[in-house]
Amino acid sequence: MPKLKTKSGAKKRFIPKKSGKVKFRRAGVRHLATFGKTKKQKRHLRGTDHLAPMDAKKIKECFPYAR
């Protein structure tokens, strides 16, 4: 039986962790310095976050060899 392939779109956007959570980077960060974003918005866009459990379940299906 051939190896299962990981979805290339998912591997560019998500990182499955050993704890079972899925890490991702927030959208809207490409032009953080542009006008129209408040300090609070920029602060919340910084760093990474984890997906909700139901969304994480769907994304994990894209990673056949993730634990």
UniProtKB/Swiss-Prot annotation:
Any one GO cellular component localisation term in the record: cytosolic large ribosomal subunit
InterPro entries recorded = Ribosomal_bL35, Ribosomal_bL35-like, Ribosomal_bL35_CS, Ribosomal_bL35_sf
Molecular function GO terms recorded: structural constituent of ribosome
Q: Which SUPFAM superfamilies match?
A: L35p-like (SSF143034)
* Biological process according to GO: translation
- Keywords annotated in UniProt: Ribonucleoprotein, Ribosomal protein
Domain of life the protein comes from: Bacteria
**Record-stated family:** Belongs to the bacterial ribosomal protein bL35 family.
Q: Which NCBIfam families match?
A: rpmI_bact
Name of the protein in its database record: Large ribosomal subunit protein bL35
Q: Which gene encodes it?
A: rpmI
